[in-house]
Structure formats: C-alpha cells, structure tokens
C-alpha cells in the first residue's frame, strides 16, 4: 500500500487526514492532489514520521541536509545537527553521509528524528563499489536498485534518484563547454558510470522497476 495507490482508489489514509488538518485544507483536496501526483506525503511505516504534505497548494517546506564525509566523520555531531534542525523548525532531514559506517549512521539518525527522513542511495552504492571493486564505475545496476530497497527497509521515507542523468543528457554535456560539467555529486556518479559502460542510467531505463 502506498499513499498514491490508495488515493487513486478513492481512499483517504490517516496521513492524508493529518496533512489536511495541518494545512487547514479539505481532506478530499489532499487526496486528489496525491492521486494526481501533485502532492506527496513521505511516509515509510517502518519509520512512521509525522505526516507532511509537499506540493501544489501547500505551505513551503524546509529540508535540512546533514551528513558525514570521508575526511570528517563524527556521528554524535550528526545526531546533534539533526536535533538542532528539528528544533529550528525543519520539516524534513536528509542524510548525505559518505564517510563512516553508513548503515549505522542512517539507523541512528532515523531513531533520532520523527520528521520525514531522506537519503541519496547512489552515494552508498558508489562508496561500497569503491570498497569492494575499487571504483564507482564498477557498481552494477543491481547494486543501485538493491541499495534503494535496503534503505527503504531501514525506514527511509524519501530518496533522491538521479533519473534525469541519461545517455542523451551526458552526451549534451560532453559537447558543451561548461566550467564544471556536473555539480551534483550523485549525478556525477551516474555520469561516470554511463560514460564508462556506454549504457543508459538503470534508474531511467528501468524506472517502473525502481518504483516497485
């Protein structure tokens, strides 16, 4: 069961009701917005965060990014950052960690915050490929999908997936004279993989499978 599948069936979930109350909106308007794909409610029952609506006709929401790096990894500081973000009124938190034990960091932060929690799965997929095989480009399509599923099972409520980095977009970038071809870290991971294998981005190629 997902919020959008229930909305398309004409059913109203407790989360939709909570969002309607928070937004001072009619529940039916929220349901229709979710069904149309104009509103999302990041909610993983494993984490069960507070209900939050994002999208058309709703209040602006603030997301706070935190996370370790290979050069600086202090889990206690990330926990404190998460607490400060929540106290300051952030509506969501994202863990962008690339250093340390990523599963432990994510699990700890999920236990720390009760608001929607997001990640960028390709970070972990790429970093584990470096550890196991020596390079980001050596990760497999299965590695990418498996990491998304693994993090969802941990309780992650929403994720960034770089579906728009495709063979076509990478080829366009190669022809342009940009100072920095790609400013997105996750996008750079995908671009390197696409250039090395001369294959389509698995998240784009098998988007329906990604949604499953």
Describe the predicted segments one by one.
Residues 2-212:
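Alpha/beta enzyme core
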């Amino acid at each position: 069961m997902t919020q959008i599948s229930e909305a398309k069936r004409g059913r109203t979930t407790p989360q939709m009701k909570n969002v309607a109350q928070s937004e001072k909106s009619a529940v039916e308007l929220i349901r229709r917005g979710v069904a149309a794909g104009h509103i999302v409610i990041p909610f993983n029952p494993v984490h069960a965060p507070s209900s939050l609506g994002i999208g058309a006709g709703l209040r602006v929401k603030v997301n706070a990014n935190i996370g370790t790096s290979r050069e600086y990894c202090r889990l206690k500081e990330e926990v404190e950052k998460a607490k400060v973000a929540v106290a300051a009124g952030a509506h969501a938190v994202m863990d962008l960690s690339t250093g340390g034990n990523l599963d432990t960091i994510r699990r700890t932060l999920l236990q720390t915050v009760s608001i929607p929690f997001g990640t960028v799965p390709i970070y972990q997929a790429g970093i584990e490929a470096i550890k196991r095989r020596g390079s980001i480009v050596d990760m497999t399509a299965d590695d990418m999908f498996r990491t998304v599923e693994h993090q969802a099972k941990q309780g992650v409520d929403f994720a960034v997936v770089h579906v728009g980095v495709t063979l076509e977009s990478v080829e366009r970038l190669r022809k342009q004279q940009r100072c920095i071809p790609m400013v997105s870290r996750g996008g750079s991971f995908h671009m390197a993989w696409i250039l090395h294998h001369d294959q389509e981005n698995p998240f784009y190629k098998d988007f329906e499978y990604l949604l499953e």
